[in-house]
Structures are given as structure tokens and as C-alpha cells.
Regions:
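A short, proline-enriched helix->beta-strand linker immediately N-terminal to the Walker B motif
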Residues: 151-155
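Helix-to-loop junction immediately C-terminal to a conserved catalytic motif
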Residues: 48
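Conserved ABC ATPase "signature" C-loop
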Residues: 211-212
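Conserved ABC ATPase "signature" region
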Residues: 109-127, 180
Length: 232
């Protein structure tokens, strides 16, 4: 589904990814953890073409991202970040259906039904559809962000510390929601976090990164019972 082949990336004199190789099979929930600046976000953004390798290749569904129409690619991949990225002047319903609308789906009734269905999928009631982002709590906004990512019928979901700003109770609820959604929709999820407990709870596998390289890749149990080195 997603493959990195000998990827190198630098910003100025700083090497961010170094001969990076990784394969993420379809339907896997991969959590990624590491210190700030280790290359996590750069790696994630290469999947949807927001960053390009200096050398090597990134493939999504066997297609080289560098040779793919990026608008089409990005509309097919859900992307959720910590600050939700919702448009404040749009209702929740309009936010959720933004990608389908700009992709040509103009039927208002159909889009409304899609928004309501996705609200229910992420655990929010129908009456939220006509509210604006500023009328929602942080946890509710994050759920709407996930619903919007799902609206394009994406099979891949990229998440960059999506729950980092939430309180612990809301964070745990969202984690459980994501586990349920992933099982229900069989999505491929790449999820960056600074929270080791979150990484262990959510990931089928956990990728530990350090200085642009893979320090260890394995199941939560493998990471806990057989750490590769003192850093891990």
C-alpha cells in the first residue's frame, strides 16, 4: 500500500531522512513515535506529496508519488492534524463535505446525508451539522476533522498528533473511536504521536524513529519485550 525506498531528505544542511526504507501494508494501523526533529512529520508528508525526496522513491498503491497528480492523490488521502484545520466560516456540514464538493459532487441533499452519516460514524449527533467550529469543544472539532478526512472515501488516513491538545478523558475516548473506525473501515492509518502509551495502544506496529532513521519497528509487544537498544 505505502512504500519508502531508500529515501533521503535534507532541509539546508540538516539531514531529516537518511536511506529510509519502510513498507506499510494495506489495513495496518502504524503509530510513529520519536523525538522532535527526528523526521516523523517529513515522512508523513511525503505520503501525500507535501514533501518530496531528494533521492529514493515513495510509492502509494504501487504508484510513485513524484509522478502522480498530486491534487487527485491528496483528495484520496485523509489528513488530520492537531489544530483540526476546520474552516471557521463554514458549518460543520460544509466542512465535512468540502472535498466531495470541490471534486464535483454538488447535490446538496446527498452531501447533507453524507455529513450526517459521518457525524454519526465519529460519535456526534445530527444537530451538530449546522453549527460552526467555534461553537464546538476541542474534542468535537477533532471528531469533525476526522469525519472530513473520511468524506473523500479515503483508504489512507494520515494523522499528525491529532489528539495532542485534548484533555486526557477526551483523548482516551478519541483513541477508542479510532480503533473502532479502523476495524470498521479497514483503513491504512499512519499516526504520529509523542505519547508512548498512545502509540502502544493504537498501533498494530510501532515505528520508533531517531535522527532520520528507523530505530525499531515492531508490534507493541515486541517493542516492550525486546527493545533494540538503550534509546528505544
Amino acid at each position: 500500500m505505502i512504500r519508502f525506498e531508500h529515501v533521503n531528505k535534507s532541509f539546508g544542511n540538516e539531514q531529516v531522512l537518511i536511506d529510509f526504507n519502510l513498507e506499510i501494508p494495506e489495513g495496518e494501523f502504524l503509530t510513529v513515535i520519536g523525538r522532535s526533529g527526528c523526521g516523523k512529520t517529513t515522512m508523513l508528508r511525503m505520503i501525500n506529496g507535501l514533501h518530496t525526496p531528494d533521492s529514493g522513491r515513495v510509492l502509494v498503491q504501487e504508484k510513485n508519488v513524484a509522478e502522480t497528480d498530486l491534487i487527485t492523490l491528496r483528495r484520496s488521502i485523509g489528513y488530520v492534524i492537531q489544530n483540526k484545520g476546520l474552516f471557521p466560516h463554514m458549518t460543520v456540514s460544509e466542512n465535512i463535505t468540502y472535498v466531495p464538493v470541490i471534486s464535483g459532487k454538488k447535490d446538496k441533499l446527498e452531501n447533507r446525508r453524507l455529513a450526517v452519516r459521518l457525524l454519526k460514524t465519529v460519535g456526534l449527533p445530527e444537530e451538530m451539522a449546522d453549527r460552526y467550529p467555534l461553537e464546538l469543544s476541542g474534542g468535537q472539532q477533532q471528531r469533525v476533522g476526522i469525519a472530513r478526512a473520511l468524506a473523500a472515501d479515503a483508504k489512507i488516513l494520515l494523522m499528525d498528533e491529532p489528539f495532542g491538545a485534548l484533555d486526557e478523558i477526551t483523548k482516551r475516548a478519541m483513541q477508542n473511536e479510532m480503533l473502532s473506525l479502523q476495524k470498521q473501515l479497514h483503513m491504512t492509518i499512519v499516526f504520529i504521536t509523542h505519547d508512548i502509551q498512545e502509540a502502544m495502544k493504537l498501533g498494530d506496529r510501532v515505528l520508533v524513529m531517531e535522527k532520520g532513521r528507523i530505530a525499531q519497528l515492531g508490534t507493541p509487544r515486541e517493542i516492550q519485550e525486546h527493545p533494540a537498544d538503550d534509546f528505544v
